Amino acid sequence: MLNADYKIEAIKVLLNEDCILTRFYSLIPYKDILVQNLIKMRCHTKSDCMKLSDESLLDAGLEDAGMVQLFKSFLTLYDINPGKLKEITAVCKNAEEMQSFQELYQLPGVKYTRAMLYFKAGFRFLADIAISSPQEIIAKTEGIIRKENLSLKVPLLKEVKTHIAVARAFTDTLIE
């Protein structure tokens, strides 16, 4: 099941150097204590955390107001722009593609080209990506590019790791 309001435990998967922007790196040392304290505060999902006051987030282990604002920004990092989804109906050829692309477009930076590459490589849903290794995704997409002589680039390792982390968070497949 796809869930953009991910469990708070997903912070441990999402908050690492492999899949976030450098401006969020300073939050990494806080992730374990944050998750532990947020759960104690009965904050179980991203939306629960978004409702917390700045004071509550300080109590959860963040050191100052700047870190609180950075954490709030991090929580919205993987929110999808609804306008991005409008493209799907224009580019999809059938219901199967449309269903697949609705999930794949949840991944950061994914639009038609990357979604089509993942689709052709057999990664049709976030659950497929969540249980895959970066090496498997890179190898399969590279194979499709070669086989179909596509003028596309293989996804970068960091991009694939980000997609795997987000897919795991959104499907509750929390493998660290």
Regions found by a protein language model. Give the residues of each.
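C-terminal extensions
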Residues: 1-176
